[in-house]
Design a protein with these regions (language model features):
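Charged phosphate-binding loop/patch that engages nucleotide di/tri-phosphates or the phosphate backbone
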Residues: 125, 129-139
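Intrinsically disordered, low-complexity, charged/polar segments
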Residues: 34-62, 112-128
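SH3/SH3-like beta-barrel fold
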Residues: 25-33
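Short beta-strand-centered aromatic/proline hotspots
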Residues: 6-7, 13-26
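Intrinsically disordered, low-complexity regulatory segments enriched in Ser/Thr/Pro
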Residues: 83-116
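Amphipathic, interaction-prone secondary-structure segments
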Residues: 60-93
């Protein structure tokens, strides 16, 4: 399920969703400053990847972290007042976020979720009151 400001692919190009309806998704073409409607089934999710995380300020801290008998790559994002840890599963070549830990005011809030796509990560950040980070991802 998509939400406003989620970033998706349309014809291989990243687009930001600016309105939603049952039949159409209106997306904003950032470089051309024009709006157009597209069928929702023409929209594809963007997979979370290591290059995407690094482009958006996340740093690979440990290549392999083990918990629950699975192996993960640990990425960290640091900013004034908070830190984010993402643990990316490397099981069966399936790259997904298995654990999201957000530290605010020295308190860590852990969310165990399976996130495969950028829009899912954006929505998780919004639920944790990190709207500005979610809405400013670089693709």
């Amino acid at each position: 399920m998509y939400a406003l400001n989620d970033i998706v692919l349309y014809k291989g190009e990243p687009k930001r969703i600016v309105s939603l309806s049952n039949e159409y998704v209106e997306t904003y073409i950032k470089l051309e400053d024009i709006y157009f409607n597209i069928l929702q089934n023409g929209v594809e999710p963007i997979e979370i990847s290591k290059p995407f995380l690094m482009k958006n300020g996340f740093v690979l801290k440990k290549l392999l972290v083990t918990f629950d008998e699975d192996k993960f790559a640990k990425f960290v994002y640091l900013n004034d007042g908070f830190a984010i840890e993402l643990y990316i599963s490397e099981k069966d070549d399936d790259l997904n976020v298995a654990r999201l830990v957000i530290h605010k005011n020295n308190v860590g809030n852990m969310i165990d979720v399976k996130l495969n796509y950028v829009h899912e990560l954006q929505q998780a950040f919004r639920m944790c009151n990190l709207q500005y980070l979610a809405d400013n991802f670089k693709i």
